[in-house]
Regions:
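Long, low-complexity, charged/polar intrinsically disordered regions in eukaryotic proteins
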Residues: 1-29
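Long, charge-rich, low-complexity alpha-helical segments
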Residues: 30-117
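Core alpha-helical transmembrane segments of integral membrane proteins
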Residues: 99-198, 240-243, 247
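Loop-to-transmembrane boundary segments
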Residues: 118-133, 213-234, 305-335, 388-395
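Membrane-embedded catalytic scaffold of the fatty acid hydroxylase/desaturase
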Residues: 160-314
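Membrane-embedded alpha-helical segments of integral membrane proteins
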Residues: 323-375
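Internal/C-terminal transmembrane anchor helices
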Residues: 381-413
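Hydrophobic alpha-helical membrane-insertion signals
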Residues: 388, 406-534
Length: 534
């Protein structure tokens, strides 16, 4: 539809290049910014209700009234022109569901929080700050290497519950510093960070700081610096903790600092994963200078799959490496949610009916993602002209392959438990609802924050499980005098030098992957919701 007197939608902001070599950026409420050419940017800046001929005279060569009309039609289709195609944005909300795996709560505008120190951030030497941060990062790694014995004690032995609380509280505080590292770096380059807040990202609590204004920066290296600032900041904090720990005498205080340092380093490392929208992805996107890299790579990968499976014509629009990158991006969320299900399911099942429903919803969503992926592939192939018979055959082959994998791939059915000693001997401590077989081999361990150390072995004796009060530290890596409800069985043929209580692993016979999934996830959920036993 031709717009006789085009006017830019009032909620659209057009940013001129910040410096030579930078891009024109169009900012839209609750949407990703658009990068446009200089000619389109100039046109958008002049759309004030005049007719195309008047606009063409003001803009000069190469614009004509016809070119202005054609460009306005395309901009109108994007919702940038005032009129029926440009719906007014909804009021800015504090709580935003970005996707089923990302829920955000906006707390405050980061640029306002950083305003008091903005002059300092602008004047700071970027090279000096980077050198200092890298020196702390490397110095911390050297400090950890020099404290091997204390590090093993901190990561591989039970710690007080207060130590765990301090480590995770410190990690939460460091996450806030991490995000402000992004905002501070963008501010240094004369950009303006957006919202700061907290979010649930793939079932994991986290913070965020919007730095989409970084697309206005002239150099890709500046955008990479903004993306990597959080990781470098967090790793520098980890290095500080490790070096301080080297000056602290042995004990729980030293273990707290070492545990906090390692957890921070690992958190920074996880943020480098480029297959989900973490810092590593943002840095990669900035480095290759391809906006919406992940979405476009996944589209490229789907097109490549259609070509390989059905012979549908594939026109490559991105570098060849984006195909394997896109395939990994497609499958990675399923992997992350699967790990999250394994991590949280036993905790949630301990919450009763509500926890059982949550686990069921999580497993259902995992299944939905898998089915949706196959359905999307078949639907796109059908739209490209692939016959129904070939599509049906492909679906049958894919489902048969999944069935064969679940049937013939065997996994170890180990059960995590604990042990405790008293005057009557050593007993296996089981979480409620766990079933084991008499005579099964048991590894007795000392559990810690990151890993366990084998102390000995035993076998499960005959008899019925006894419901009783057990040490909480037998089921967790916490050193505490708290007790909880659990089930116990006698252990026989005990060998090794054992702690008073600790972790245990019951070695189970290998079983098909499908049976293992049902035994460890589906049946416990069924029992929790419907209260039925085998």
């Amino acid at each position: 539809m031709t717009v006789a007197a085009p006017r830019r939608a009032p909620w659209i902001t057009v940013h001129e290049p910040m410096a030579e070599g930078a891009h024109w950026i169009v900012e839209r409420p609750d949407a990703s910014p658009l990068r446009v050419s200089a000619d389109i940017g100039a046109l958008l800046s002049t759309l004030d209700g005049r007719d195309p001929a008047s606009l063409a005279r003001q803009l000069g060569v190469p614009w004509t009234a016809e070119l202005v009309s054609h460009a306005v039609e395309r901009l109108d289709g994007l919702g940038l022109i005032e009129g029926p195609n440009a719906a007014a944005p909804k009021p800015e909300r504090r709580f935003v569901v970005v996707s089923p795996t990302t829920w955000q709560l906006r707390v405050a505008k980061a640029d306002r929080l950083l305003a008091p120190i903005r002059p300092l951030l602008v004047r700071l030497s970027g090279h000096a700050v980077l050198f200092t941060a890298l020196a702390l990062l490397v110095g911390g790694l050297i400090a950890l290497a020099c404290q091997g014995s204390a590090l093993g004690q901190a990561l591989g032995a039970p710690l007080p519950l207060s130590t765990f609380a301090l480590i995770w509280a410190g990690l939460a505080a460091t996450t806030v510093v991490h995000e402000f590292g992004h905002g501070a770096t963008l501010t240094h380059f004369h950009g303006r960070p957006g919202w700061f807040g907290v979010m649930l990202f793939y079932l994991t609590p986290a913070c965020f700081c919007e730095v989409t204004d970084g697309w206005r920066l002239a150099k890709p290296s500046q955008r990479v610096s903004v993306a990597m600032a959080g990781v470098v900041t967090q790793a520098a904090v980890a290095g500080c903790a490790a070096m301080v720990a080297s000056a602290v005498p042995g004990g729980d205080g030293k273990s707290t600092l070492l545990g906090f340092s390692v957890v921070c380093y690992l958190s920074a490392l996880v943020n480098l994963i480029p297959f989900v929208k973490l810092d590593g992805y943002l840095a990669l996107m900035a480095y290759v200078d391809i906006p919406h890299l992940r979405d476009r790579s996944m589209a490229e990968a789907r097109s490549w799959l259609l070509w390989r499976l059905f012979g549908v014509r594939h026109v490559r629009s991105l570098p060849v490496w984006t195909v394997p990158f896109g395939l990994t991006c497609i499958g990675f969320p399923v992997l992350v949610l699967g790990i999250a299900a394994g991590r949280w399911s036993h905790v949630l099942l301990g919450m009763g009916l509500v926890g059982g429903v949550l686990v069921l919803l999580l497993l259902g969503y995992l299944g939905y993602l898998l089915v949706r992926g196959l359905w999307s592939l078949l639907r796109n192939a059908h739209r490209a002209g692939v016959g129904t018979a070939r599509l049906a055959l492909t679906a049958v082959v894919a489902l048969s392959a999944c069935g064969a994998l679940l049937t013939f791939l065997e996994v170890d059915n180990d059960i995590r438990a604990g042990y405790a000693q008293d005057s009557s001997g050593v007993h296996l401590v089981l979480p409620p609802g766990t079933e084991v077989t008499a005579g099964s081999h048991v590894e007795l361990e000392r559990g810690g924050l990151m890993f366990s150390t084998s102390l000995g072995s035993a076998r499960i004796g005959a008899g019925q499980t006894q419901r009783t009060t057990v040490p909480f530290s037998a089921l967790t890596p916490f050193r505490t005098g708290v007790t909880t409800e659990g089930s116990t069985l006698p252990l026989i043929d005990v060998t090794g030098r054992l702690d008073p209580n600790g972790a245990a692993r019951v070695r189970g016979a290998p079983m098909p992957a499908g049976t293992w999934l049902a035994h460890n996830y589906l049946l416990p959920v069924w029992h929790q919701i419907f209260g039925q036993e085998d």
